[in-house]
Amino acid sequence: MVVIGIDFSIQFPAACICRDFKEFQWIACVNANTTKAYRKFLEDVQAENSSLNFIFLEPRERQAKGQETYSGTERLKLANYSHLVDQFVSGIKSLVKNDDQIIVSIEGIAYGAQGNALIDISQATGMVRKAMLDKVLIGEKERLFIFSPGELKNAIGAKGNAGKFDVYQTFMKDPKIAENSSLHTCINMNTENIIKGQEVKSPFMDMIDSYLAVLKIHESLKEFD
């Protein structure tokens, strides 16, 4: 069985692909605004860890300054989000086999965002859910699970309202079934490049969050044993 955990965002979407709760792979999209030095660090990480995969995104298409229109803005959002979702889902598909029994676990929308930001992430999240249902699950909606952010934090032993850094600390202290995984080891070995004060740089925090979606399925199945 393969469980795909997804933490979707417009900036750094990430997925954890777990086979039989023993083997882990991660894939994450990297924003085009990433500095050259940090991109080089991520490229080195990828070269050293075959189970940590990054998709380096091209700059998004934008309207010419001073010529913005409402329709133009919405068209570009749709085009940019479609391209992002296509790349992300294609990357996930490249890491699973056609005969795999797949479960997809996705973090639900966090409503901390407001206004246009909430509208944008809701629109893009709907697109990635449909793409996963159509292209990965081949319409088998019963294999798609959506959990609230609080439920996923609880799965690793953090409070439902825990902040990102608290979740990171919990993961590093006790990663549960991901102990000795490439992600846990990589963060341990590269703390100076990944942690800045109490900020966990993307896409590593996003990759941790995607793992929580896998862990939630594992914990849920244990309840039926």
Feature-to-residue mapping (PLM):
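Phosphate- and other anionic-substrate recognition elements at nucleic-acid/protein interfaces
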Residues: 1-225
